[in-house]
Design a protein with these regions (language model features):
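Metal-ion/cofactor- or nucleotide/acyl-coenzyme-handling active-site neighborhoods
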Residues: 2-283
Length: 283
């Protein structure tokens, strides 16, 4: 039985590896992310989950004394100007394809005028930034190309920036970018990932997915999210969750191979791939 399972696993990894090689050949572009971390310096990656509100209130000193990486609509929150993150990442196509969305337009307006400190913005390699960013914002590119297969192939793809674990959530490219920047210790906050608690199915068989954030989403964002999920079935959403949580284990394996320690500092987070450690006392 174990021999058959091993043979099956080998062919499965072979197929995944070939598929990944083809994807990288077609989709990957040159990236320009270089190590910048000082020796012993730790990075805090901030998801936008509801727990981030408590983290900001209870860990102001840690947040002020570490480089921060923010994601998605965080720049539209009032707290953003206080946090002054050095790094920012956008991955969802909505940020580059829909300037009719008031929240997206406000995001780019903020990148143009609100950032008064040096910041590096990471965006997918193939997108076109729809507006001119401010003088303090430096743009760098990453490849959001999902790579699966043999560990040696994944390691080469991840290390060269040609690909990453399947990026079903912005936190995946965020952590991988932190590793590429040379940080040997990474803390993750605001990564509740408790989406399954908010899933519902209406009497019309419409899946309702509420994804709360530390900031209050306006009605336009609720409408946009509802339209995205309008024709998606529950099994598709659950599979997406599966892919995201599995990707964290790929990150953990790769991080271990690079001597990088990733701590999940999000209270009650559903991510089970990384050891837990409170942000208080972060080195």
């Amino acid at each position: 039985m174990s021999i058959g399972k091993n043979i099956s696993g080998f062919f499965e990894k072979s197929a995944s590896s070939l598929k990944s090689l083809a994807k990288m050949a077609i989709q990957s572009r040159r990236c320009d992310i270089k190590p910048v971390a000082a020796p012993g310096e730790s990075l805090i990656v901030m998801g936008n989950g509801p727990s981030l509100a408590d983290t900001m209130r209870d860990n102001a000193e840690a947040l002020a004394s570490h480089p921060l990486l923010a994601v998605n609509f965080a720049i539209n929150a009032p707290e953003f100007l206080e946090l002054r993150p050095e790094f920012y990442i956008l991955a969802d196509p909505v940020f580059f394809n829909d300037l009719t969305n008031a929240n997206v337009r406000r995001l780019w307006d903020n990148f143009s005028s609100a950032v008064t400190w040096p910041m590096t913005l990471f965006v997918p390699a193939k997108v076109r930034i729809p507006v001119k960013t401010g003088a303090n914002v430096t743009v760098r590119r990453f490849n959001p190309v999902g790579v699966e297969g043999f560990a040696w192939l994944e390691n080469i793809a991840f290390r060269t920036g040609a690909g990453m674990p399947r990026p079903r959530n912005v936190l995946i490219p965020a952590i991988m970018t932190g590793i590429a920047l040379g940080f040997k210790t990474i803390y993750i906050v605001g990564a509740d990932h408790s989406w399954s608690k908010t899933l519902e199915v209406s009497d019309e068989n419409v899946v309702i997915s509420v994804q709360p954030h530390f900031y209050k989403d306006n009605e336009a964002e609720h409408t946009r999210v509802a339209s995205v999920y309008k024709n998606i079935r529950l099994h598709e959403i659950m599979y997406s969750f599966y892919v995201a949580f599995r990707s964290y284990f790929s990150i953990r394996r790769y991080a271990d191979s690079r001597g990088v320690t990733i701590y999940n500092s999000t209270p009650s987070s559903f991510i089970d791939a990384f050891p837990r450690r409170p942000l208080k006392g972060a080195s």
